[in-house]
Structure formats: structure tokens, C-alpha cells
Amino acid sequence: MNGGLGRIFKEHPDRRYIMFGGKGGLGKTTFSAAAAYYLAKQGQRVLVFSVDPQASLSDIFQQDIFGKGPVEIMPNLYAQEIDADKRIKAYQGEIRKKIFDMYGFDKIPDEIESYIQAAAAEPAMEESAIFDEVVDIVVAGKYDYYIYDLVPLGHALYYLSMASVYDEWIERITKLREDMRQYEEMAAAISKDKEVEEDMILKELQYIKHRISTSSSILTDRHKTAFFFVVIPEEMILIDTQKAAQLFAKFNVPLSGYVVNRVIPESLASLDIPEYLRNRLQMQKGYLKKIDELFGAEVLARVPEFERDITGLPMIEKMATALFGPIQ
């Protein structure tokens, strides 16, 4: 069963946006790096980027990439860890500039500056900053494949829902702005300069809406996007994954299949091994059977437990081979 993802990628060459989802610590980042390695070896220009504030791509590639934009790891393979703090500071600068441009203030009023500073400390601001950076990355369209190193399941659902929430919010604000303009025009109470300011605000809202729409349409496009759930042969993981799959379906995220990680080789059972390991193998056998019963043909690969951590390109290549088959 190893190497099953290679078949999916060959059968669906238009699926250029790749995501691995699952609970924390199951191997999502490792699989993301391995998929990027495989595709780069096929001559595709690939960007793997983390939307997790506690990103570990730097550790896996053994290279500091945090906050440095796309970093070339090897030919065709680029990796990026988004610096949310840097993005938030850029937000603040953009907000100040827009206030100057739209309202002609000589300086930002103290109460507005206080709000700008306070908003940066909001818990959701980090996720918002990362989301906006992802929109920039995707809209730019510089790569053949984009691989999202997602946060754990709960946060991933929040991230995936942000597009629809933002879209609805922008839609309402834009409608309100348009209504306000109509009332003001009917009252003939605005000057020429004011009309220009109103147009700038509407233009900005429409620009934001277009960016969000572009990103969200990719996430739910069955022809362009592949989403893989990562599971391991353990009871609670299977229960959580079933629940998560139902929730992801509500956001119309196209599920391409399941990948089973950390499978202890059954061949060990014929050796002189400790009793606890023999018990683990017996338990695993039952869970693997249950995985097959639950997910059937959607199980694309069983990845073995490796002898060491997956860090550095040689080990990433081993993982890529387990996922996709021989690397050419």
C-alpha cells in the first residue's frame, strides 16, 4: 500500500494545492515536506509553507527559514515559515497610511492609535495575519504546487472557516458603504473630495473581497485542491478523525484520502522482541483492520515507523518514497 499518493497525483495533475490535516504530532509537517520533495524531484516548482505559529519546517529541513520569505531548500523546492508579528506590524503601517490618505489627518488621533495598538494584541490577530499572508502567497501564483503545512485539527477548522467569515463580513460592510453613499448623494451633502474618499473606501473593500474570494475558492475546489487526513493506528485518533472529516465536509473541503503513519512493521512479530512491543503489534493489527473498515479504498498509504526522526533531505527522501513510491 506504500506509495499510493503517487497514483493520486498522477490521476489528478490539476490538484495543485495540497494539505495534510490531523491532530498535532501525527506527522503533518513531515508529510508536507516529503510531498514537496517528491514534486520538486518531478521538475515542479513547489512552495511548502506553514500556517502554524509553532512551525517546525525549519527543524525538518535543518535550516532557519522563519520570517525570511520563500527560502530555496534545493532546486524547485522552496519553504516558508510566516512571521505573524512582522505581518501585524505591516498591518499597522498600512492602516495608518490609509487613514492619512482617506481623511487627510496631519497625525493619527491618539484614540485611533490606541485602537491600532490594542487590536494588534487580540488573540485572533495572529491567525488573521497568517491568513492574509497565505492569500498573498496564493494570489501571486509563482509556483506550480502549494503545500499547506496546517495547524492541528481544531485550529485548522478555524483557519478554513476564516475565508467564509471574512467574505460575509466584507460583503456586509460593502453593502453598508454603498447604502451610505446613496443616502448622502440623495441629500446632496457631500463635496467632490468626499466623493473621492468614499470611492477609495469602496475600492479597498472590493479589493479585499476579491483576495478572500480567490483564496477561499481554491480551498474548496475539488479540481484544484487535495486534502489528506493523517492518522495513526490508535483508538482516540480514529474517533477524532471521523468527527473532523464530518466537520471539514461542512466547509466543502475536498477529501482525497487518508494516510496511516507510524505503522510498526509486522515482520517484527517473528523476532525475539519485548512483550510490550508484541502487545503493541497486536493492538495495531486491530486498529489497522478498523481503519480499513472505516475508510476502505480511501486509505492511500501505510507509512512505517522509521528508525530515526525525519530531519534533513536524506530522511525526507525516505519518507517521500514511502508516500509516493520510488523517486526518479
Where are the language model's segments positioned?
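Short, hydrophobic/aromatic alpha-helical segments in well-folded domains
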Residues: A34-A35, E133, T214, A244
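C-terminal lobe/tail of nucleotide-utilizing enzymes
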Residues: M1-H12, T214-Q328
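Electropositive phosphate-/nucleotide-binding environments in soluble metabolic enzymes
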Residues: S128, K209, L281, K285
